[in-house]
Amino acid sequence: MSKQEFKSDLQKGYDELKRFGVTKTSAHFFLPPYEWYNDSIAAWTKEMNLQLVNFTPGTLSNADYTTPDEKNYRSSETIYQSIINYEQKNGSGLNGFILLMHIGTDANRTDKFYSRLPDLIQYLKTKGYQLVRIDELLK
């Protein structure tokens, strides 16, 4: 991908978001597709005054898009337990973690992980966590 292709593609995304009142100023975080980036993508993102972000690995939260027919499939229960186990075993818990969840997943994935969010939020709140938006986390 060239620099111009990257900038053009990103601008097309912002043009579409503008229809919903979302601007580059209000949405200045960039999570690359498939969480893949290199030094060029990082530099181009910075040139566009955007903040490159990525999820924190280790919890399997990013596997919520997988479907049962895939080799790397993880059920919502597996993902939920992985997050809980990580929180319990890691000395710092999940402080500062960015969990990635997909609101749009394949129809073949019937156990949508976002359906477990109320359980996860309740668990984390009982452990004393305060959930914040990414712009608050990265101030």
Give, region by region, the residue ranges found by the protein language model.
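Catalytic domains of cell-wall/extracellular-matrix polysaccharide-remodeling enzymes
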Residues: 1-100, 104-125, 130, 136-138
